[in-house]
């Protein structure tokens, strides 16, 4: 795999984290650059680690992992997104409804959920001639950049939306989960078509 293909892969893999970061940034009144960088760093590190794990597991057993990763991602994202939607629906003041929503634990759970597709990519990369450390580093760096930008973009969207920002952020997470599930189910259905 050449450098341009790896870069395209890296930025493609960062899109889920970017969308989640926009939603997360929108729920904050004004996320500071420090908070945006923290989010980008957490998303980037986890996004870099998961293809390494997937690559290692792919050398052992790719079929089992690829059978379940999309369900785990969907469940985590739907749960986190559902919590955000319910809190926004109750129309709690934004400051109180978000207590704990941006905690390290929630941030890591969101990052893991959006990076499970990178786990599957890692499994696939195990079948190719690729420098996995180079690919993982580029994926992590692209995700760090895109997540930081996403948080900062969400900053401008949030004040316009008020308490609806949490609902939209939750719907974005649910949408990402549904997209992951849909793409894997669609691929499975296409694989079973005759001809």
Curated annotation (Swiss-Prot):
The chain crosses the membrane at residues 3-23, 40-60, 68-88, 106-126, 132-152, 165-185. It is a multi-pass membrane protein. Pfam families: Mntp. Keywords: Cell inner membrane, Cell membrane, Ion transport, Manganese, Membrane, Transmembrane, Transmembrane helix, Transport. GO terms for molecular function: manganese ion transmembrane transporter activity. It is found in: Cell inner membrane. One of its GO terms (cellular component) is plasma membrane. InterPro entries: Mntp/YtaF, Put_MntP. The keyword Manganese applies. The keyword Membrane applies. Signal peptide: none annotated. Its main location: membrane. PANTHER family: MANGANESE EFFLUX PUMP MNTP-RELATED (PTHR35529:SF1). Probably functions as a manganese efflux pump. Belongs to the MntP (TC 9.B.29) family. This is Putative manganese efflux pump MntP. The gene is mntP.
């Amino acid at each position: 795999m050449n450098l341009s293909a790896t870069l395209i892969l890296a930025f493609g893999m960062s899109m889920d984290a970017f969308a989640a970061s926009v939603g997360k940034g929108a729920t904050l009144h004004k996320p500071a650059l420090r908070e945006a960088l923290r989010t980008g760093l957490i998303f980037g590190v986890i996004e870099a680690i998961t293809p390494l794990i997937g690559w290692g597991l792919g050398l052992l057993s790719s079929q089992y992992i690829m059978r379940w990763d999309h369900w785990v991602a969907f469940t985590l994202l739907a749960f986190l997104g559902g919590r955000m939607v319910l809190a926004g629906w109750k129309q709690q003041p934004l400051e109180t409804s978000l207590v704990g929503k941006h905690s390290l634990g929630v941030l890591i759970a969101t990052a893991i959920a959006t990076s499970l597709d990178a786990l599957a990519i890692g499994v696939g990369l195990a079948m190719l001639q690729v420098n996995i450390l180079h690919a993982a580093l580029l994926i992590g760096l692209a995700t760090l950049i895109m997540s930081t930008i996403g948080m900062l973009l969400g900053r401008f969207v949030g004040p316009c939306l008020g308490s609806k920002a949490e609902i939209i952020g939750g719907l974005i997470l649910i949408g990402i989960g549904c997209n992951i599930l849909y793409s894997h189910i669609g691929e499975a259905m296409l694989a079973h078509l005759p001809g």
